[in-house]
Amino acid sequence: PRCYRYCKNKPYPKSRFCRGVPDPKIRIFDLGRKKAKVDEFPLCGHMVSDEYEQLSSEALEAARICANKYMVKSCGKDGFHIRVRLHPFHVIRINKMLSCAGADRLQTGMRGAFGKPQGTVARVHMGQVIMSIRTKAQNKEHVVEALRRAKFKFPGRQKIHISKKWGFTKFNADAFEEMVAQKRLIPDGCGVKYVPGRGPLDRWRALHAA
């Protein structure tokens, strides 16, 4: 509901003081071909939040399913990797009111109004990435459309942004292949290892001899 959209309270995570929290609806945060090597999927699209708000775990789950369905249909089930970048750790509460007649015994109104845990939400800042998709460069339109469809599951305003970075790495796409060729980056699964320009010379020689 609308009242759970705004970040009014301090973060209230599940802890030994906050017990009996229902499980978050979203359980899977990575979909598609998540084992794909870093050089297979150079293009990366982000959905970026434009508001400081809370997104429920139900909304995250709905958006994840929606984006996944469209990407599977358009790019094949092995043609992409979606990652949900938010995790719902903040617990929201509800002060249960009994509305039926004859509920005089439990109807306390605002006496003892600290609520019981109802569900979990993720707190998102302005400019924070909600969801990312990496895929091949020719699938750019599909990425934008998948994120556009997933946007309808969230309150507030989101922007879709095609990243300048290579896949899910932090290195710019135009310099990425050159850095790999110079062995300044070593592909490692869906990420890369950065080789700094300092350290023992024999390690550098061993790397370049390989």
Swiss-Prot record:
Cysteine pairs bridged by disulfides in the record: none
Entry GO terms, CC: cytosolic large ribosomal subunit; nucleus
Highest taxon of the lineage: Eukaryota
Location of this chain's protein in the cell: Cytoplasm
GO molecular function: structural constituent of ribosome; translation regulator activity
Record-linked NCBIfam families: PRK04199.1-4, uL16_euk_arch
Similarity comment: Belongs to the universal ribosomal protein uL16 family.
Protein name: Large ribosomal subunit protein uL16
Upper classification of the organism: Eukaryota, Metazoa, Chordata, Craniata, Vertebrata
Gene: RPL10
